[in-house]
Curated annotation (Swiss-Prot):
<dbReference type="InterPro" id="IPR044140">
    <property type="entry name" value="ProRS_anticodon_short"/>
</dbReference>
<dbReference type="InterPro" id="IPR006195">
    <property type="entry name" value="aa-tRNA-synth_II"/>
</dbReference>
<comment type="similarity">
    <text>Belongs to the class-II aminoacyl-tRNA synthetase family. ProS type 1 subfamily.</text>
</comment>
<dbReference type="InterPro" id="IPR036754">
    <property type="entry name" value="YbaK/aa-tRNA-synt-asso_dom_sf"/>
</dbReference>
<keyword id="KW-0963">Cytoplasm</keyword>
<protein>
    <recommendedName>
        <fullName>Proline--tRNA ligase</fullName>
        <ecNumber>6.1.1.15</ecNumber>
    </recommendedName>
</protein>
<dbReference type="GO" id="GO:0005524">
    <property type="term" value="F:ATP binding"/>
</dbReference>
<keyword id="KW-0030">Aminoacyl-tRNA synthetase</keyword>
<dbReference type="InterPro" id="IPR007214">
    <property type="entry name" value="YbaK/aa-tRNA-synth-assoc-dom"/>
</dbReference>
<dbReference type="InterPro" id="IPR002316">
    <property type="entry name" value="Pro-tRNA-ligase_IIa"/>
</dbReference>
<dbReference type="GO" id="GO:0002161">
    <property type="term" value="F:aminoacyl-tRNA deacylase activity"/>
</dbReference>
<dbReference type="InterPro" id="IPR033730">
    <property type="entry name" value="ProRS_core_prok"/>
</dbReference>
<dbReference type="Pfam" id="PF04073">
    <property type="entry name" value="tRNA_edit"/>
</dbReference>
<dbReference type="InterPro" id="IPR036621">
    <property type="entry name" value="Anticodon-bd_dom_sf"/>
</dbReference>
<dbReference type="Pfam" id="PF03129">
    <property type="entry name" value="HGTP_anticodon"/>
</dbReference>
<dbReference type="InterPro" id="IPR002314">
    <property type="entry name" value="aa-tRNA-synt_IIb"/>
</dbReference>
<dbReference type="Pfam" id="PF00587">
    <property type="entry name" value="tRNA-synt_2b"/>
</dbReference>
Protein backbone atom coordinates (compact mmCIF):
# COMPACT_ATOMS: atom_id res chain seq x y z
CA UNK A 1 0.00 0.00 0.00
CA UNK A 2 1.27 3.48 -0.87
CA UNK A 3 0.08 6.37 1.25
CA UNK A 4 -0.64 8.56 -1.79
CA UNK A 5 -3.33 6.05 -2.79
CA UNK A 6 -4.73 5.60 0.69
CA UNK A 7 -6.97 7.85 2.80
CA UNK A 8 -5.23 9.29 5.86
CA UNK A 9 -7.57 11.57 7.81
CA UNK A 10 -5.49 12.58 10.83
CA UNK A 11 -6.46 15.60 12.93
CA UNK A 12 -4.44 17.79 15.28
CA UNK A 13 -7.31 18.28 17.74
CA UNK A 14 -9.85 15.91 19.25
CA UNK A 15 -13.59 16.75 19.13
CA UNK A 16 -15.04 18.51 22.15
CA UNK A 17 -17.34 15.59 23.00
CA UNK A 18 -14.47 13.08 23.28
CA UNK A 19 -13.97 12.28 26.97
CA UNK A 20 -11.56 9.34 27.05
CA UNK A 21 -8.26 8.63 25.35
CA UNK A 22 -9.50 5.98 22.92
CA UNK A 23 -12.29 8.21 21.60
CA UNK A 24 -9.92 11.14 21.13
CA UNK A 25 -7.25 9.08 19.42
CA UNK A 26 -9.60 7.13 17.17
CA UNK A 27 -10.97 10.40 15.81
CA UNK A 28 -7.57 12.09 15.55
CA UNK A 29 -6.00 9.03 13.90
CA UNK A 30 -8.69 9.02 11.21
CA UNK A 31 -10.27 5.75 12.34
CA UNK A 32 -13.83 6.92 12.98
CA UNK A 33 -16.13 9.86 12.32
CA UNK A 34 -19.41 10.51 14.12
CA UNK A 35 -22.66 10.21 12.16
CA UNK A 36 -25.07 10.46 15.11
CA UNK A 37 -24.91 9.80 18.84
CA UNK A 38 -23.22 6.42 19.28
CA UNK A 39 -23.11 5.77 15.50
CA UNK A 40 -19.87 6.04 13.52
CA UNK A 41 -18.36 5.76 10.09
CA UNK A 42 -15.32 3.49 10.15
CA UNK A 43 -12.75 5.11 7.88
CA UNK A 44 -10.11 3.03 6.05
CA UNK A 45 -7.56 3.10 8.88
CA UNK A 46 -10.17 1.96 11.39
CA UNK A 47 -11.64 -0.65 9.09
CA UNK A 48 -8.24 -2.27 8.57
CA UNK A 49 -7.94 -2.85 12.32
CA UNK A 50 -11.53 -4.11 12.52
CA UNK A 51 -10.86 -6.65 9.77
CA UNK A 52 -7.78 -7.91 11.63
CA UNK A 53 -9.77 -8.38 14.83
CA UNK A 54 -12.46 -10.21 12.86
CA UNK A 55 -9.88 -12.46 11.22
CA UNK A 56 -8.43 -13.58 14.56
CA UNK A 57 -11.91 -14.12 16.01
CA UNK A 58 -13.00 -16.09 12.94
CA UNK A 59 -9.87 -18.27 12.94
CA UNK A 60 -10.27 -19.21 16.59
CA UNK A 61 -14.02 -19.81 16.32
CA UNK A 62 -13.44 -22.12 13.36
CA UNK A 63 -10.61 -23.84 15.24
CA UNK A 64 -13.02 -24.50 18.12
CA UNK A 65 -15.50 -26.16 15.75
CA UNK A 66 -18.06 -23.35 15.50
CA UNK A 67 -19.91 -22.90 12.20
CA UNK A 68 -20.38 -19.45 10.67
CA UNK A 69 -23.75 -18.22 9.42
CA UNK A 70 -25.42 -14.83 9.09
CA UNK A 71 -28.72 -13.85 10.67
CA UNK A 72 -30.80 -10.75 9.91
CA UNK A 73 -30.36 -7.54 11.87
CA UNK A 74 -34.13 -6.96 11.64
CA UNK A 75 -36.13 -9.44 13.72
CA UNK A 76 -39.92 -9.92 14.04
CA UNK A 77 -41.45 -9.05 17.40
CA UNK A 78 -43.16 -12.45 17.57
CA UNK A 79 -39.86 -14.18 18.34
CA UNK A 80 -39.12 -11.76 21.18
CA UNK A 81 -42.64 -12.16 22.51
CA UNK A 82 -42.16 -15.93 22.56
CA UNK A 83 -39.00 -15.65 24.64
CA UNK A 84 -40.51 -13.04 26.97
CA UNK A 85 -37.82 -10.47 26.25
CA UNK A 86 -40.20 -8.17 24.34
CA UNK A 87 -41.50 -7.04 27.74
CA UNK A 88 -38.27 -7.53 29.70
CA UNK A 89 -35.66 -5.81 27.58
CA UNK A 90 -36.62 -2.15 28.04
CA UNK A 91 -35.96 0.94 25.91
CA UNK A 92 -32.53 -0.26 24.73
CA UNK A 93 -34.41 -2.51 22.31
CA UNK A 94 -35.10 -0.44 19.18
CA UNK A 95 -38.62 -1.28 18.02
CA UNK A 96 -40.39 -0.17 14.86
CA UNK A 97 -43.32 -1.04 12.59
CA UNK A 98 -43.24 -1.82 8.90
CA UNK A 99 -45.78 -0.45 6.40
CA UNK A 100 -48.18 -3.28 7.29
CA UNK A 101 -48.08 -2.29 10.97
CA UNK A 102 -46.07 -5.37 11.97
CA UNK A 103 -43.71 -4.96 14.93
CA UNK A 104 -39.99 -5.51 14.45
CA UNK A 105 -36.76 -4.89 16.35
CA UNK A 106 -33.17 -4.14 15.39
CA UNK A 107 -31.34 -6.99 17.06
CA UNK A 108 -29.06 -6.26 20.02
CA UNK A 109 -28.49 -10.03 20.27
CA UNK A 110 -29.77 -13.04 18.35
CA UNK A 111 -30.87 -15.67 20.89
CA UNK A 112 -34.42 -15.69 19.56
CA UNK A 113 -33.48 -15.96 15.89
CA UNK A 114 -30.92 -18.71 16.42
CA UNK A 115 -33.33 -20.66 18.64
CA UNK A 116 -35.88 -20.43 15.84
CA UNK A 117 -33.28 -21.89 13.47
CA UNK A 118 -32.51 -24.70 15.89
CA UNK A 119 -36.13 -25.68 16.54
CA UNK A 120 -36.81 -25.89 12.82
CA UNK A 121 -33.59 -27.61 11.77
CA UNK A 122 -32.44 -29.77 14.70
CA UNK A 123 -34.70 -32.76 15.33
CA UNK A 124 -32.46 -35.43 16.85
CA UNK A 125 -29.72 -35.74 19.46
CA UNK A 126 -27.51 -36.98 16.60
CA UNK A 127 -27.41 -33.44 15.18
CA UNK A 128 -25.76 -32.07 18.32
CA UNK A 129 -23.53 -30.60 19.53
CA UNK A 130 -23.62 -27.67 17.13
CA UNK A 131 -22.35 -24.13 17.59
CA UNK A 132 -23.42 -21.36 15.20
CA UNK A 133 -21.67 -17.97 15.08
CA UNK A 134 -21.80 -14.75 13.13
CA UNK A 135 -19.95 -11.43 12.96
CA UNK A 136 -22.56 -8.77 12.44
CA UNK A 137 -23.72 -5.25 13.24
CA UNK A 138 -25.94 -4.86 16.32
CA UNK A 139 -27.92 -1.97 17.75
CA UNK A 140 -28.75 -1.06 21.34
CA UNK A 141 -30.47 2.25 21.95
CA UNK A 142 -28.24 3.39 24.83
CA UNK A 143 -29.77 6.24 26.81
CA UNK A 144 -26.45 8.08 26.86
CA UNK A 145 -24.01 6.88 24.21
CA UNK A 146 -20.51 8.08 25.04
CA UNK A 147 -16.83 7.19 24.95
CA UNK A 148 -16.81 6.60 21.19
CA UNK A 149 -16.94 2.90 20.31
CA UNK A 150 -16.82 1.91 23.98
CA UNK A 151 -20.51 2.65 24.52
CA UNK A 152 -21.96 3.12 21.09
CA UNK A 153 -25.45 2.32 19.90
CA UNK A 154 -24.41 0.58 16.70
CA UNK A 155 -21.50 -1.83 16.96
CA UNK A 156 -19.97 -4.95 15.43
CA UNK A 157 -20.14 -8.11 17.49
CA UNK A 158 -19.28 -11.77 17.16
CA UNK A 159 -22.06 -13.80 18.73
CA UNK A 160 -22.12 -17.59 18.94
CA UNK A 161 -24.78 -19.99 20.19
CA UNK A 162 -24.24 -23.64 21.10
CA UNK A 163 -26.88 -26.38 21.30
CA UNK A 164 -26.32 -29.59 23.27
CA UNK A 165 -28.35 -32.60 24.34
CA UNK A 166 -27.24 -32.66 27.99
CA UNK A 167 -25.35 -30.80 30.71
CA UNK A 168 -22.10 -32.63 30.01
CA UNK A 169 -22.27 -31.48 26.40
CA UNK A 170 -23.06 -27.90 27.40
CA UNK A 171 -20.11 -27.88 29.79
CA UNK A 172 -17.83 -29.09 27.01
CA UNK A 173 -19.13 -26.47 24.55
CA UNK A 174 -18.66 -23.79 27.20
CA UNK A 175 -15.09 -24.96 27.90
CA UNK A 176 -14.24 -24.86 24.19
CA UNK A 177 -15.53 -21.30 23.87
CA UNK A 178 -13.78 -20.20 27.06
CA UNK A 179 -10.50 -21.60 25.75
CA UNK A 180 -11.10 -20.01 22.34
CA UNK A 181 -11.61 -16.62 23.99
CA UNK A 182 -8.36 -16.98 25.92
CA UNK A 183 -6.60 -17.64 22.59
CA UNK A 184 -8.38 -14.72 20.90
CA UNK A 185 -7.42 -12.12 23.48
CA UNK A 186 -3.90 -13.50 23.79
CA UNK A 187 -3.43 -13.22 20.02
CA UNK A 188 -4.83 -9.70 20.10
CA UNK A 189 -1.89 -8.79 22.33
CA UNK A 190 -4.01 -7.52 25.21
CA UNK A 191 -3.62 -7.77 28.97
CA UNK A 192 -6.91 -9.31 30.07
CA UNK A 193 -8.63 -11.29 32.79
CA UNK A 194 -11.48 -13.78 32.62
CA UNK A 195 -13.79 -13.10 35.55
CA UNK A 196 -16.82 -14.83 37.02
CA UNK A 197 -19.85 -12.69 36.25
CA UNK A 198 -23.58 -12.16 36.59
CA UNK A 199 -25.66 -13.20 33.58
CA UNK A 200 -27.68 -9.97 33.45
CA UNK A 201 -30.59 -9.55 31.01
CA UNK A 202 -29.38 -12.41 28.79
CA UNK A 203 -30.25 -14.85 31.57
CA UNK A 204 -28.76 -18.23 32.32
CA UNK A 205 -26.86 -20.16 34.93
CA UNK A 206 -23.12 -19.63 34.61
CA UNK A 207 -21.03 -16.96 32.94
CA UNK A 208 -17.61 -15.36 32.60
CA UNK A 209 -16.64 -11.93 31.33
CA UNK A 210 -13.37 -11.15 29.58
CA UNK A 211 -11.98 -7.77 30.56
CA UNK A 212 -9.13 -5.75 29.12
CA UNK A 213 -7.35 -4.19 32.09
CA UNK A 214 -7.38 -0.38 31.86
CA UNK A 215 -7.64 2.47 34.35
CA UNK A 216 -10.57 3.94 32.40
CA UNK A 217 -12.59 0.71 32.53
CA UNK A 218 -16.22 1.05 33.58
CA UNK A 219 -16.22 -2.24 35.49
CA UNK A 220 -14.55 -2.97 38.80
CA UNK A 221 -12.83 -6.35 38.95
CA UNK A 222 -12.00 -8.14 42.16
CA UNK A 223 -8.98 -10.40 41.81
CA UNK A 224 -6.39 -12.15 43.93
CA UNK A 225 -2.77 -11.37 42.95
CA UNK A 226 -1.59 -14.67 44.44
CA UNK A 227 -4.12 -16.96 42.73
CA UNK A 228 -6.27 -17.30 39.62
CA UNK A 229 -9.38 -15.89 41.28
CA UNK A 230 -11.06 -13.02 39.42
CA UNK A 231 -14.69 -11.87 39.37
CA UNK A 232 -16.74 -8.89 38.42
CA UNK A 233 -17.29 -6.97 41.64
CA UNK A 234 -21.04 -7.57 41.16
CA UNK A 235 -20.45 -11.33 41.43
CA UNK A 236 -17.52 -11.59 43.86
CA UNK A 237 -18.54 -13.19 47.14
CA UNK A 238 -17.75 -11.37 50.38
CA UNK A 239 -16.91 -14.19 52.76
CA UNK A 240 -18.31 -14.33 56.29
CA UNK A 241 -15.87 -13.46 59.05
CA UNK A 242 -14.21 -16.42 60.71
CA UNK A 243 -13.87 -14.83 64.15
CA UNK A 244 -16.81 -15.20 66.52
CA UNK A 245 -18.91 -12.15 67.35
CA UNK A 246 -17.54 -10.31 70.40
CA UNK A 247 -19.68 -10.14 73.54
CA UNK A 248 -21.46 -6.82 74.25
CA UNK A 249 -19.27 -4.37 76.16
CA UNK A 250 -21.49 -1.27 76.09
CA UNK A 251 -25.00 -0.35 77.13
CA UNK A 252 -27.39 0.79 74.40
CA UNK A 253 -27.57 4.59 74.50
CA UNK A 254 -29.31 7.28 72.48
CA UNK A 255 -26.81 9.97 71.47
CA UNK A 256 -27.25 13.39 69.89
CA UNK A 257 -25.73 13.71 66.42
CA UNK A 258 -26.96 17.12 65.22
CA UNK A 259 -26.68 17.48 61.45
CA UNK A 260 -24.72 14.24 61.12
CA UNK A 261 -26.64 12.16 58.58
CA UNK A 262 -23.65 10.34 57.06
CA UNK A 263 -21.78 7.46 58.66
CA UNK A 264 -18.46 9.26 58.23
CA UNK A 265 -19.74 12.33 60.08
CA UNK A 266 -21.24 10.23 62.88
CA UNK A 267 -18.00 8.30 63.33
CA UNK A 268 -16.00 11.52 63.50
CA UNK A 269 -18.38 13.11 66.03
CA UNK A 270 -18.42 10.06 68.30
CA UNK A 271 -14.68 9.45 67.83
CA UNK A 272 -15.19 5.85 66.77
CA UNK A 273 -13.99 3.88 63.73
CA UNK A 274 -16.24 4.10 60.67
CA UNK A 275 -16.37 0.29 60.82
CA UNK A 276 -18.56 0.51 63.95
CA UNK A 277 -21.32 2.46 62.20
CA UNK A 278 -24.23 0.97 60.25
CA UNK A 279 -25.49 2.21 56.90
CA UNK A 280 -29.26 1.62 56.59
CA UNK A 281 -30.69 1.30 53.07
CA UNK A 282 -34.44 1.04 52.57
CA UNK A 283 -35.90 -0.98 49.69
CA UNK A 284 -39.47 -1.74 48.68
CA UNK A 285 -41.22 -4.53 46.81
CA UNK A 286 -44.74 -4.24 45.47
CA UNK A 287 -47.72 -6.28 46.65
CA UNK A 288 -50.73 -6.28 44.35
CA UNK A 289 -53.65 -4.53 45.98
CA UNK A 290 -51.75 -3.85 49.21
CA UNK A 291 -49.08 -1.57 50.57
CA UNK A 292 -45.50 -2.46 49.67
CA UNK A 293 -43.17 -4.59 51.74
CA UNK A 294 -40.38 -2.46 53.19
CA UNK A 295 -36.91 -3.93 53.64
CA UNK A 296 -34.07 -2.51 55.74
CA UNK A 297 -30.66 -3.56 54.42
CA UNK A 298 -27.90 -3.05 56.98
CA UNK A 299 -24.32 -2.52 55.84
CA UNK A 300 -21.17 -1.56 57.67
CA UNK A 301 -20.48 2.15 57.28
CA UNK A 302 -17.50 1.65 54.97
CA UNK A 303 -19.24 -0.88 52.69
CA UNK A 304 -21.36 -0.41 49.55
CA UNK A 305 -24.61 -2.12 48.57
CA UNK A 306 -24.46 -4.72 45.79
CA UNK A 307 -27.84 -4.56 44.06
CA UNK A 308 -27.14 -7.64 41.94
CA UNK A 309 -26.72 -9.74 45.07
CA UNK A 310 -29.81 -8.18 46.65
CA UNK A 311 -31.93 -8.97 43.58
CA UNK A 312 -31.10 -12.67 43.97
CA UNK A 313 -32.48 -12.87 47.51
CA UNK A 314 -35.95 -14.40 48.03
CA UNK A 315 -38.63 -11.75 47.59
CA UNK A 316 -36.26 -9.05 46.31
CA UNK A 317 -35.96 -9.84 42.61
CA UNK A 318 -37.99 -6.78 41.59
CA UNK A 319 -36.98 -4.45 44.41
CA UNK A 320 -36.74 -0.68 44.18
CA UNK A 321 -35.47 2.01 46.50
CA UNK A 322 -38.18 3.23 48.85
CA UNK A 323 -39.53 6.73 48.32
CA UNK A 324 -38.90 9.40 50.94
CA UNK A 325 -42.59 9.35 51.86
CA UNK A 326 -42.48 5.58 52.38
CA UNK A 327 -39.42 5.99 54.58
CA UNK A 328 -41.19 8.59 56.71
CA UNK A 329 -44.31 6.40 56.93
CA UNK A 330 -42.38 3.32 58.11
CA UNK A 331 -39.57 4.91 60.14
CA UNK A 332 -41.00 8.23 61.26
CA UNK A 333 -38.02 10.18 59.97
CA UNK A 334 -36.45 11.13 56.64
CA UNK A 335 -33.27 9.39 55.41
CA UNK A 336 -30.06 9.94 57.35
CA UNK A 337 -31.11 8.76 60.80
CA UNK A 338 -32.65 5.36 60.04
CA UNK A 339 -32.22 2.15 61.96
CA UNK A 340 -33.90 -1.10 63.01
CA UNK A 341 -34.72 -0.01 66.57
CA UNK A 342 -38.27 1.29 67.09
CA UNK A 343 -39.66 1.53 63.56
CA UNK A 344 -43.23 2.87 63.16
CA UNK A 345 -44.29 -0.13 61.05
CA UNK A 346 -42.79 -3.61 60.77
CA UNK A 347 -39.94 -3.91 58.28
CA UNK A 348 -37.97 -6.90 57.06
CA UNK A 349 -34.36 -6.62 58.19
CA UNK A 350 -31.45 -8.15 56.29
CA UNK A 351 -27.98 -7.75 57.74
CA UNK A 352 -24.88 -8.15 55.65
CA UNK A 353 -22.60 -10.95 56.84
CA UNK A 354 -20.18 -8.41 58.29
CA UNK A 355 -22.93 -6.58 60.19
CA UNK A 356 -24.23 -9.84 61.65
CA UNK A 357 -20.82 -10.31 63.24
CA UNK A 358 -20.67 -6.84 64.82
CA UNK A 359 -21.08 -5.82 68.46
CA UNK A 360 -21.63 -2.41 70.10
CA UNK A 361 -22.48 -0.77 66.79
CA UNK A 362 -24.17 2.55 66.00
CA UNK A 363 -27.47 2.85 64.11
CA UNK A 364 -29.90 5.64 63.37
CA UNK A 365 -32.47 6.34 66.11
CA UNK A 366 -35.32 7.00 63.65
CA UNK A 367 -35.29 10.56 64.92
CA UNK A 368 -33.64 13.53 63.25
CA UNK A 369 -30.26 14.45 64.83
CA UNK A 370 -30.04 11.25 66.92
CA UNK A 371 -28.35 7.86 66.70
CA UNK A 372 -28.22 4.85 69.03
CA UNK A 373 -24.82 3.57 70.17
CA UNK A 374 -23.90 0.28 71.83
CA UNK A 375 -26.46 -1.78 69.90
CA UNK A 376 -26.07 -5.57 69.97
CA UNK A 377 -27.76 -8.52 68.31
CA UNK A 378 -29.69 -10.83 70.59
CA UNK A 379 -29.81 -8.30 73.42
CA UNK A 380 -31.23 -5.19 71.74
CA UNK A 381 -32.33 -6.61 68.41
CA UNK A 382 -33.47 -10.07 67.33
CA UNK A 383 -30.94 -12.07 65.35
CA UNK A 384 -31.31 -10.89 61.74
CA UNK A 385 -31.69 -12.62 58.44
CA UNK A 386 -28.13 -12.68 57.10
CA UNK A 387 -26.94 -12.46 53.49
CA UNK A 388 -23.99 -11.32 51.39
CA UNK A 389 -25.28 -7.98 50.07
CA UNK A 390 -22.15 -5.86 49.71
CA UNK A 391 -19.37 -5.24 47.24
CA UNK A 392 -16.06 -6.78 48.15
CA UNK A 393 -13.25 -4.32 48.83
CA UNK A 394 -9.48 -4.33 48.73
CA UNK A 395 -8.04 -6.44 51.52
CA UNK A 396 -11.02 -8.80 51.87
CA UNK A 397 -10.10 -12.50 51.93
CA UNK A 398 -10.18 -14.09 48.49
CA UNK A 399 -13.08 -16.56 48.07
CA UNK A 400 -10.61 -19.24 46.98
CA UNK A 401 -8.76 -18.94 50.29
CA UNK A 402 -5.43 -18.16 48.61
CA UNK A 403 -4.82 -14.54 49.56
CA UNK A 404 -6.61 -11.21 49.70
CA UNK A 405 -8.65 -9.24 47.20
CA UNK A 406 -7.34 -6.37 45.12
CA UNK A 407 -9.47 -4.19 42.83
CA UNK A 408 -8.68 -3.04 39.29
CA UNK A 409 -10.68 -1.54 36.44
CA UNK A 410 -11.59 -3.44 33.30
CA UNK A 411 -13.33 -2.98 29.96
CA UNK A 412 -15.62 -5.87 29.07
CA UNK A 413 -14.83 -7.14 25.57
CA UNK A 414 -16.21 -10.68 25.75
CA UNK A 415 -18.84 -12.65 27.64
CA UNK A 416 -19.71 -16.35 27.73
CA UNK A 417 -22.95 -17.73 29.21
CA UNK A 418 -24.48 -21.07 29.97
CA UNK A 419 -28.11 -20.38 29.14
CA UNK A 420 -29.45 -23.85 29.84
CA UNK A 421 -33.06 -24.22 28.66
CA UNK A 422 -34.15 -20.58 29.17
CA UNK A 423 -34.85 -19.99 25.47
CA UNK A 424 -35.44 -23.53 24.27
CA UNK A 425 -38.26 -24.09 26.76
CA UNK A 426 -39.83 -20.69 26.09
CA UNK A 427 -39.71 -21.20 22.32
CA UNK A 428 -40.26 -24.95 22.07
CA UNK A 429 -36.81 -25.89 20.76
CA UNK A 430 -36.83 -29.62 21.44
CA UNK A 431 -35.11 -32.71 20.04
CA UNK A 432 -35.73 -36.44 20.32
CA UNK A 433 -33.33 -38.13 22.73
CA UNK A 434 -31.96 -41.69 22.51
CA UNK A 435 -35.27 -43.11 23.73
CA UNK A 436 -37.33 -41.04 21.29
CA UNK A 437 -38.62 -38.59 23.90
CA UNK A 438 -38.67 -34.83 23.25
CA UNK A 439 -36.22 -32.82 25.38
CA UNK A 440 -35.35 -29.10 25.44
CA UNK A 441 -31.99 -28.21 23.94
CA UNK A 442 -29.32 -26.86 26.29
CA UNK A 443 -27.88 -23.59 25.04
CA UNK A 444 -24.82 -21.45 25.54
CA UNK A 445 -24.12 -18.01 24.10
CA UNK A 446 -20.78 -16.35 23.55
CA UNK A 447 -20.14 -12.73 22.54
CA UNK A 448 -17.10 -10.67 21.53
CA UNK A 449 -17.34 -6.91 21.01
CA UNK A 450 -15.29 -6.48 17.84
CA UNK A 451 -15.41 -2.69 17.62
CA UNK A 452 -15.15 -2.29 21.38
CA UNK A 453 -11.88 -4.23 21.29
CA UNK A 454 -10.32 -1.37 19.32
CA UNK A 455 -11.20 1.17 22.00
CA UNK A 456 -10.09 -1.15 24.79
CA UNK A 457 -6.77 -1.88 23.08
CA UNK A 458 -6.07 1.84 22.77
CA UNK A 459 -6.94 2.49 26.43
CA UNK A 460 -4.22 -0.02 27.27
CA UNK A 461 -1.71 1.04 24.61
CA UNK A 462 -1.06 4.75 24.07
CA UNK A 463 1.30 7.60 24.91
CA UNK A 464 1.33 11.37 24.43
CA UNK A 465 2.05 10.92 20.71
CA UNK A 466 -0.82 8.59 19.91
CA UNK A 467 -1.81 4.93 19.68
CA UNK A 468 0.64 2.04 20.20
CA UNK A 469 -1.03 -0.90 18.46
CA UNK A 470 -0.20 -4.53 19.15
CA UNK A 471 1.13 -5.92 15.85
CA UNK A 472 -1.84 -8.26 15.45
CA UNK A 473 -4.43 -5.51 15.02
CA UNK A 474 -2.40 -2.53 13.79
CA UNK A 475 -3.78 -1.07 10.55
CA UNK A 476 -0.25 -1.52 9.17
CA UNK A 477 2.63 -3.43 10.73
CA UNK A 478 5.41 -1.23 9.36
CA UNK A 479 5.63 2.18 7.70
CA UNK A 480 8.42 3.25 5.36
CA UNK A 481 9.27 6.94 5.60
CA UNK A 482 11.56 7.95 2.70
CA UNK A 483 13.23 11.35 2.94
CA UNK A 484 12.69 12.99 -0.46
CA UNK A 485 10.98 10.12 -2.23
CA UNK A 486 10.00 12.38 -5.14
CA UNK A 487 13.43 14.07 -5.34
CA UNK A 488 16.05 11.36 -4.86
CA UNK A 489 16.43 8.37 -7.17
CA UNK A 490 18.60 6.66 -4.54
CA UNK A 491 15.95 7.03 -1.84
CA UNK A 492 13.08 6.04 -4.12
CA UNK A 493 14.84 2.92 -5.40
CA UNK A 494 15.84 1.84 -1.88
CA UNK A 495 12.34 2.48 -0.52
CA UNK A 496 10.67 0.60 -3.37
CA UNK A 497 13.09 -2.33 -2.94
CA UNK A 498 12.46 -2.47 0.81
CA UNK A 499 8.72 -2.23 0.23
CA UNK A 500 8.82 -5.14 -2.22
CA UNK A 501 10.90 -7.29 0.17
CA UNK A 502 8.54 -6.71 3.09
CA UNK A 503 5.43 -7.29 0.98
CA UNK A 504 6.92 -10.52 -0.38
CA UNK A 505 7.49 -11.66 3.21
CA UNK A 506 3.78 -11.16 3.94
CA UNK A 507 4.28 -8.02 6.01
CA UNK A 508 1.49 -5.44 6.03
CA UNK A 509 3.54 -2.42 4.95
CA UNK A 510 2.69 1.11 3.84
CA UNK A 511 5.11 3.39 2.03
CA UNK A 512 4.60 7.09 2.71
CA UNK A 513 5.15 8.66 -0.71
CA UNK A 514 3.01 11.75 -0.01
CA UNK A 515 5.98 14.13 -0.08
CA UNK A 516 5.25 15.45 3.42
CA UNK A 517 7.94 16.92 5.66
CA UNK A 518 9.58 14.39 8.03
CA UNK A 519 7.90 15.91 11.09
CA UNK A 520 4.45 15.55 9.52
CA UNK A 521 5.13 11.98 8.41
CA UNK A 522 6.41 10.91 11.81
CA UNK A 523 3.58 12.61 13.68
CA UNK A 524 0.91 10.98 11.49
CA UNK A 525 2.26 7.45 11.86
CA UNK A 526 2.94 7.80 15.58
CA UNK A 527 -0.63 9.04 16.02
CA UNK A 528 -2.01 6.15 13.94
CA UNK A 529 0.18 3.81 15.98
CA UNK A 530 2.05 1.73 13.39
CA UNK A 531 4.33 -0.55 15.47
CA UNK A 532 7.49 -0.32 13.28
CA UNK A 533 9.03 2.53 11.29
CA UNK A 534 11.91 2.52 8.82
CA UNK A 535 13.36 5.84 7.66
CA UNK A 536 15.24 5.85 4.36
CA UNK A 537 17.51 8.83 3.67
CA UNK A 538 20.42 9.58 1.33
CA UNK A 539 22.91 10.12 4.15
CA UNK A 540 22.14 6.77 5.73
CA UNK A 541 22.09 4.93 2.41
CA UNK A 542 25.56 6.23 1.56
CA UNK A 543 26.71 4.55 4.78
CA UNK A 544 24.67 1.42 4.05
CA UNK A 545 22.22 2.15 6.89
CA UNK A 546 18.46 2.53 7.39
CA UNK A 547 16.99 4.01 10.56
CA UNK A 548 14.62 1.80 12.56
CA UNK A 549 12.37 2.74 15.48
CA UNK A 550 9.71 0.64 17.17
CA UNK A 551 6.65 2.56 18.33
CA UNK A 552 7.49 1.76 21.95
CA UNK A 553 11.20 2.59 21.58
CA UNK A 554 12.62 5.77 23.09
CA UNK A 555 15.40 6.03 20.49
CA UNK A 556 16.00 5.03 16.89
CA UNK A 557 18.71 2.56 15.85
CA UNK A 558 20.57 2.03 12.58
CA UNK A 559 20.23 -1.23 10.67
CA UNK A 560 22.32 -2.47 7.73
CA UNK A 561 20.25 -1.57 4.68
CA UNK A 562 20.42 -5.07 3.25
CA UNK A 563 19.21 -6.58 6.54
CA UNK A 564 16.42 -4.11 7.36
CA UNK A 565 13.58 -6.10 5.81
CA UNK A 566 14.64 -9.36 7.44
CA UNK A 567 15.19 -7.72 10.83
CA UNK A 568 11.77 -6.06 10.90
CA UNK A 569 10.08 -9.20 9.59
CA UNK A 570 11.63 -11.20 12.41
CA UNK A 571 10.47 -8.64 15.01
CA UNK A 572 6.90 -8.74 13.69
CA UNK A 573 6.75 -12.53 13.54
CA UNK A 574 8.12 -12.78 17.07
CA UNK A 575 5.45 -10.36 18.31
CA UNK A 576 2.70 -12.37 16.58
CA UNK A 577 3.94 -15.73 17.88
CA UNK A 578 1.76 -15.81 21.00
Amino acid sequence: MKASRFFIGTLKEAPADAEIVSHKLMVRAGMIRRVAGGIYNYLPVGLRSIRKVEAIVREEMNRAGAIELLMPAVQPAELWQESGRWEQYGPELLRFKDRKDNDFVIGPTHEEVVTDIARNQIKSYRQMPVNFYQIQTKFRDEIRPRFGVMRGREFIMKDAYSFDKDTAGLNESYRKMYDAYVRIFTRLGLEFRAVAADSGSIGGNFSHEFHVIADTGEDAIAYCPTSDFAANIEAAEALPLIAARAAPAEAMEKVATPGKAKCEAVAELLAIPLERTIKSIVLATENEGAEPTIWLIMLRGDHDLNEIKVSKLPGLKNHRFATEQEIVDWFGTPPGYLGPVGTKKPVKVIADRTVANMSDFVVGANEVDYHIAGVNWGRDLPEPEVADVRDVKKGDPSPDGKGTIDICRGIEVGHVFQLGTKYSEAMGATFLDESGKPQPMLMGCYGVGVTRILGAAIEQNFDDRGIIWPESIAPFEVVLCPMGYDRSDMVREAADKLYAELAAAGIDVILDDRGERPGVMFADWELIGVPHRLVIGERGLKEGKIEYQGRRDAEATLLPADEAAATVTEKIRAALAH
